[in-house]
Amino acid sequence: TKSRSNYAIKNNQVALSDSQIKKNLDTKIITTRQDSQKAATAKYKAAAESSKYTLTSPYVKVNPYGTSPLSALVTFKTSNNVKVTYTVVGKTAKTSITNTVKGGYTTSHQVPVVGLYADTTNTVKITATTKAGKTQTKTLKLKTSALPKYIKNATITTKNVDKTKMAIGKNKLTVINRTTKQPFAIDADGAVRWYDTNYSQHTIEQWSNGHIMILSKKNQNSDVYNDLIETDYLGRVYKEYGFANKTSSTDGGVETTVIHHDLVELPNHNFLATVSDGSKYKEDTL
């Protein structure tokens, strides 16, 4: 019978030594994305420390790192120590997203706003609260662009929605990570409230520090997903791992994506990944 593959079947070894596996994986920490963001990060930090920006007139940047169009960064200073909470007002019942900024009471504020609607002038409320309980609120209007076609055309169906029984109804979103294209998140009524413009494959995990790990690729035209990115929901990249394309299995042909389907954080914050190691079999090595 004819093979259904378009490539020659290889005769890889059944088992490899640890040293050969490490050589095949060729894991490296790279800084391409971090380096490209340094100027923006410095700009936002300076804005948060500048007396030019206040709660009544803050610095606002939608999509601050160019990869998270339904997020925004709001920065300002206050004369007193305050804690800050934001609310993205929902379009339907119990879909408003409210979060309090980590860091407690301070005078310099960088507020990561997540959960905007696409192609909408969103209403966002920023509330500063003093230790004595005095509050001040600023209402912002943040305009976003339309969804990209691969998300816009995705079929999202909700039925029998009972928000009283759903954690999603308490300021949380459900992340949808498909075989390819952009990962996105929806609220209890199925509205898209976050997405990342980086293409992702199978793997997107929440880390204990609030960051997310996304298996992506250098650009949308690349064949393989061999960039593992530690990022946040605003799109800032904190660490990036690169892998070699030397691990295709016997039946894998040109498929040289290293990590497949799973990634887990350990208590010491190292992580384990399921990978193909270049042996006869695939997706069977941690």
Predicted regions and their residues:
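Short beta-strand segments within Ig-like beta-sandwich modules, predominantly Fibronectin type-III
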Residues: 99-107
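A near-ubiquitous, low-amplitude feature marking generic local secondary-structure context
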Residues: 59, 96-99
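Basic K/R-rich, polyanion-interacting modules in nucleoproteins and related proteins
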Residues: 48-69
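Gram-positive cell-envelope targeting signals
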Residues: 1-3
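N-terminal mature-domain "stem" immediately C-terminal to a signal peptide or N-terminal signal-anchor/transmembrane
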Residues: 5-7
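Extracellular low-complexity, O-glycosylation-prone stalks/linkers
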Residues: 83-97
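Histidine-/acidic-rich catalytic cores in large beta-rich domains
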Residues: 12-13, 20, 24-33, 37, ...
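Proline/serine/threonine-rich low-complexity linkers at boundaries of modular beta-sandwich domains
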Residues: 35-55
